C-alpha cells in the first residue's frame, strides 16, 4: 500500500509542475502580445498625428493660385485708385504771359514760355522781320558746363555762341550779344534779359586777311618743318654711325685673316 501511494504521489508531482509552467508561459505570452499591441497602437497614433500635422501645415500654407489672385487684386485696386485721383499726378497747366523787351536800338525781344526767343525790328507799318530763336535750357546741367549752339547771321554764316546768349544784328551790320540769366528755382520763369557790352563778331575771311595772323601761321609752319628736319638728320647720323661700326668690325676680321694667311705662307716656304 505504501509503495502504491508513493508512486501515485510521484506521478502527481510532475503533473502539477507542468501545469504551473504552462500557466506561467501563457501569462508571459499574454504580456508580450499586450506590449506589441500597445506599441502598434502608439505607432499608428504617431503616424496619424504626423499626417494630421502635415495636413494642417499644407492647409495653412497659401497656394500659388491664391497668391496670384491676391497680387492681381492689389494691382487692380491700385489702378482704380490712380484713376479715381488723377489730380495727384497730373500737372496743372497755366497760361504764362509772354514778356516783351525793347533794346536801345529799338529792336523787340519776346520770350515764349517754351524758351523760344522772337526778335523783331520796328518799321513804319509796325513790327517787321520777326525771327524766332530756340534756346537750349541749361537749368538741369551741372555748374561750370557751357552749352554751345549755332546762330545764323544775315549773310548765311553760322557761328557758335553759348546757350545763354543771344546774338542780334543791327541795321548797320554790327552784331551785339545779349545774355539771358535764368534763376535756379524750377517755379520761377526765365524772364530776365541782361544786355552786355556789344561784341563785334568778324567773319573768318577777315581773320585770315590779318598780316599778323599770317605771320604767326608762317612761323608755326617753319618751326614744325625745322623740327622735322632735325629729327631726320639725327636719324641719318645714327644710321651712318651704325654703318661705320659694322665696317670697322669687318676691317678687323680682314686684318686677322691676312695675318693668318701670311703665317701659313711663311711656314710653307720654310
UniProtKB/Swiss-Prot annotation:
GO CC, one annotated term: ATF4-CREB1 transcription factor complex
Compositionally biased spans, kind Polar residues: 9-21
UniProtKB keywords: Activator, DNA-binding, Isopeptide bond, Nucleus, Phosphoprotein, Transcription, Transcription regulation, Ubl conjugation
Gene Ontology terms for molecular function: DNA-binding transcription factor activity, RNA polymerase II-specific; RNA polymerase II cis-regulatory region sequence-specific DNA binding
Modification note: Phosphorylated at Ser-197 by HIPK2 in response to genotoxic stress. This phosphorylation promotes transcription repression of FTH1 and other antioxidant detoxification genes. The CDK3-mediated phosphorylation at Ser-63 promotes its transactivation and transcriptional activities. Phosphorylated at Ser-63 by RPS6KA4 and RPS6KA5 in response to mitogenic or stress stimuli.
Cited Gene3D superfamilies: 1.20.5.170
InterPro entries: bZIP (IPR004827), bZIP_sf (IPR046347), CREB1-like_pKID (IPR003102), Leuzip_CREB (IPR001630)
Cross-link Glycyl lysine isopeptide (Lys-Gly) (interchain with G-Cter in SUMO2): where in chain: 207, 214
Region described as Disordered: 1-91
Residue stretches making up the bZIP domain: 212-270
Region (Leucine-zipper): 240-261
Major localisation: nucleus
Function comment: This protein binds the cAMP response element (CRE) (consensus: 5'-GTGACGT[AC][AG]-3'), a sequence present in many viral and cellular promoters. Mediates PKA-induced stimulation of CRE-reporter genes. Represses the expression of FTH1 and other antioxidant detoxification genes. Triggers cell proliferation and transformation.
Subunit organization: Binds DNA as a dimer. Interacts with HIPK2 and CDK3. Interacts with MOTS-c, a peptide produced by the mitochondrially encoded 12S rRNA MT-RNR1; the interaction occurs in the nucleus following metabolic stress.
Descriptive protein name: Cyclic AMP-dependent transcription factor ATF-1
The species this protein was found in: Bos taurus
Gene behind the chain: ATF1
Amino acid at each position: 500500500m505504501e509503495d502504491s501511494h508513493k508512486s501515485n504521489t510521484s506521478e502527481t508531482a510532475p503533473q502539477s509542475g507542468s501545469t504551473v509552467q504552462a500557466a506561467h508561459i501563457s501569462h508571459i505570452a499574454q504580456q508580450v502580445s499586450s506590449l506589441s499591441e500597445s506599441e502598434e497602437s502608439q505607432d499608428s497614433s504617431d503616424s496619424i498625428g504626423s499626417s494630421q500635422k502635415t495636413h494642417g501645415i499644407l492647409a495653412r500654407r497659401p497656394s500659388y493660385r491664391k497668391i496670384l489672385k491676391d497680387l492681381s487684386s492689389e494691382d487692380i485696386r491700385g489702378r482704380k485708385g490712380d484713376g479715381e485721383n488723377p489730380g495727384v499726378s497730373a500737372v496743372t497747366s497755366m497760361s504764362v504771359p509772354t514778356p516783351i523787351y525793347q533794346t536801345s536800338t529799338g529792336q523787340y525781344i519776346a520770350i515764349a514760355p517754351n524758351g523760344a526767343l522772337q526778335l523783331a525790328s520796328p518799321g513804319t507799318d509796325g513790327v517787321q522781320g520777326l525771327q524766332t530763336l530756340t534756346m537750349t535750357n541749361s537749368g538741369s546741367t551741372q555748374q561750370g558746363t557751357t552749352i554751345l549752339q549755332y546762330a545764323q547771321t544775315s549773310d548765311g554764316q553760322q557761328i557758335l555762341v553759348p546757350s545763354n546768349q543771344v546774338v542780334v544784328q543791327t541795321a548797320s551790320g554790327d552784331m551785339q550779344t545779349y545774355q539771358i540769366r535764368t534763376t535756379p528755382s524750377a517755379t520761377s520763369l526765365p524772364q530776365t534779359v541782361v544786355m552786355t557790352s556789344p561784341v563785334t563778331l568778324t567773319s573768318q575771311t577777315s581773320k585770315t586777311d590779318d598780316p599778323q595772323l599770317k605771320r604767326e601761321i608762317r612761323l608755326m609752319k617753319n618751326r614744325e618743318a625745322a623740327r622735322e628736319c632735325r629729327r631726320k638728320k639725327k636719324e641719318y647720323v645714327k644710321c651712318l654711325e651704325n654703318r661705320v661700326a659694322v665696317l670697322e668690325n669687318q676691317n678687323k676680321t680682314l686684318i686677322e685673316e691676312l695675318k693668318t694667311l701670311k703665317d701659313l705662307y711663311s711656314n710653307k716656304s720654310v
